[in-house]
Amino acid sequence: MPFSASAQTTESANQEKVQDSPKPVDRKTAEEIITTANDIVVVGTRASLQSATTRKREANTIVDSIVADDIASFPDKNIGDSLARITGVQLSRDFGEGTAVSIRGVEPDLNRVEINGVSQVSATGGRAGDFRELATELVKSIDVYKGYAVDLTEGGIGGTVRVETRKPLDLKDPLLTGVVSYQNLDTAETWKPRVTFVAGTPKFLIDGLGVLVNVTYSDVDTRQDYISNTNWSRLADFDHSTEKTVANPLYANYNTYESCAGVGGATTATATANRLACETQFFDWAPTVPRYRSWVRNDKRLSADLALQYQVAPNFRAYGQVQINKRNQNLQDTNYSIDLTRIERFNLDPALAAGANGGTSRPQVQLGTSTVNENHVVTSLQTALNAVNIGSVAVPNWNGAANIVGVQRRDFSYDQDSKYFTGGFRWDLDRLHIDFMGSHAKATTVSESNLISIGTSVSGITIDRDNAQGIPVFSFPSEFDPADPAVYSDFTRTGANGQVLPVYGPALQYRPSQASNTEDQLKFDADWEIDHPIVSKIEFGAQARRQNYVSYNGGGTRLLDPATLTYQQSANVSFTSQIQNNPAQVRDGNTWYITPTQYQALISSIGGTLGGAPLFTGLKNAPAGIPSNIAFPNFDADVLSQIYDLSGFDQDLVLQADGQPQIPAYLIKEKVYAGYIMADIDTEVLGMRLTGNAGLRWTQTKDEGVGTNISRVTRTTATGGTETVVLAAQEARISNTYTDFLPAFNANLAITPELSLRANYAKNLARPRPTDLVPNINCLDDQTLTGSEDVCTAGNPDLKPYRADQWEVNLAWYPNADTTISLGYYKKYEASFVIPNVTRSGVDLFHDGITYTVRQSVNGYGALLDGIEASGQTVFTFLPQPFDGFGVTGNITYARAIRTNLTNSATGGELKEYPGLSKFTYNASVFYDKGFLNARLSYNYRSKWLSTVLDAANGNNPLYRKAEGYLDGKITLRFPKYHFNVFVEMQNINREYSKVYINKDMPVDLYYPGRRMFIGLQAKL
């Protein structure tokens, strides 16, 4: 049973009840009650639950629903948080807020979300939108279609989410209401406003013309503090064990590190490479970039909805609607890390003697400077004591203790807008009913990403992960304070050998981007009622959609002159700095020269520390010794421009440069045509009413992609060396077309008036992510090797869509108007799906007969998922007053991946988990709704799940998220005589946190999104 006003659809609402059964509130009556009250909080939760139940019983396939009254009584501020209450829905959260949902284990990109019949558009490269853009105050109802009927737009393999906002002719009387609240986040220690205004009337100027305006403004502060072990890899042998960490069958007979000296090879270089491959078997796992991060977001959100409806005639109603959502965000990211990406960062033994054919060895880490557990995972270590020159005497390149500590700071705007324009009509012609809609939707994202990075040299840092959470605790020498900005400009710090450690100047970056997603749609639906003992209605319709995805990420990829390798200017800017006592010049290209005095003054001016609550406030089981604050350089343009030329830190070159348009990072033009016909069934079988439908949907998809085609060659030079040069860089265009026929069958058997059995079978599809379709191609022709194919990375416009067959049965019992008990089983067979980052040989990339070795997304086949869902709700009306106001709702879902056909790229073994699928999900809620008091306490839980199939930054391992459970609550005191309510609500009462990990020994990220409180007042006239 969904956590909110939701119950599994099992029976038609017009089913006749037995004489002594309480009569439920039908959908129309319940929604009239809600509308008459003109206040989504004042209306009782009980009536809303009854309305939601009836709404689902009337649906033509298996549906869960939430109505607006019930949403408003939840502690939810966006659609995603409300959807988490639905059976089988698993919510993805970012900064504590719901962003997207998996439905029955199917990832967000494969679920369709509609707002008033229009696709929710996203400008972030995927098909899943961000639920944070739409406030729940705008919403009238949400329907989650888990089954499929052919009158639904295809695209939701997991399910289809239909969001409907309020319409003016739904009102019976004029409406004017406002809500003012303040919200607090415990980690940010700020109070920010949230304001809602709603006004509408069913009669505006003339009879039949209705207007409704709904506006919500919210100023949201969010913050997440991360403790991270990132970039897990095997760089060196820390424990000197003879047990292999990962065995290589090519070197099965070499059972010690020292024995690898005998591997040999045809040349010294080959022998060294072979010896390293042998020694790698003994390398231990260690995080090479342990770090602390604090990410702060200030997000000013505006959601506005204007709806007009006009009753032209008793049988003809037209409408027009505009919805605008704006998010103006300021992102402040502080990343504090220790660089362990080279073996010189550790304290090393002398290298072993050269082996067969001169093959050299990689030095082992000194015993006593680290600890390693039984699974060959490093749990603590000490970094290098001195700077190590890995360059030459003439051109030194310092490593070891040099520049080992770094801090990066971003402080930039990130704005997202979406706009939806819809218009249409409903025309009733006796037995023929026609619906027509036209729409235009557009989403844009503009990013002004910048960065300042500084580093410094520190000797002998201890990193200890031997704690319950496995997270790094940094211990620095006594003279180094990570919360003091001045440590970055200290020119006197020395290593253990007494030599002064080098100091490095700052690096600056600017990475602008613009992206948009536009959809135009025409949609026609018709119902024709007929007299027939079995078929009650024929439904048919057609749809045409045109969608354009485009993104620009700085550009500069067009090769203007191959002879001189002159490229188009890029909007990206990268500056480095050199500190010299007496620099001969201020600037050489993108390198700037500053004096030690200038650098110290700069750090003094831009140095700062984190605000708000102490670092890692609220994080459960955090070990002692982690810092409460860290120092960082502010990206202060006024100060930085006194040294650096920041005139290019703008959007001027993002779209065009050198008189030519930039090649987009991706451009996908997609056209979709669809049509359907469906017969509605209404008959009797053995005295039991049988309703349902059977239909067929035809759809055709045409994709055209534009990206970048870069051709490079590695060749032998005249002096016998090798060089890699770019031969060409140009636009690449590839297209693809595919057609599908999607049958669907739904049946609903009323065994008794209170007991119904539903069944569903359907085929459905979901289209690949636009970024997977982009023909971005980067090929290398290595002419120094004979008999080998060119190697390319590329998008894959030839990707087949996700195609699935689904089955479901559901049994539901409605003993009275307030009670529902439901049990269902479902199965999904994904005939084709998409696997990212697969390397294949023999690929005819350009369809010209020439084959390449290509790393790209490819299709996988044959995944099989199933699950069991159970839900229930009731109101304790049988209890004596005042306890008759109590009620409960709850649901539980068990889901499994029977077969995934996925591979763990790190081990080569089978990957049994399916992305986004939690084995268990459950919701529980208790509410009280009577008189002046409305209160609810809600808990949402999901067990651990696979979040990433392959993470290249962490040894190609899959990444998992730990189980999470969130407790939310709200109390409303109602004073209808005075037309106002007051409320207090809290999210994440239990201070839940998130953890990303590879396995129990190898955590990646641990972070806490904070606990949020709202205090507010609602008034109604």
Task: Show which residues each predicted segment covers.
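Extracytoplasmic beta-strand/coil segments of soluble accessory domains associated
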Residues: 80-119, 146
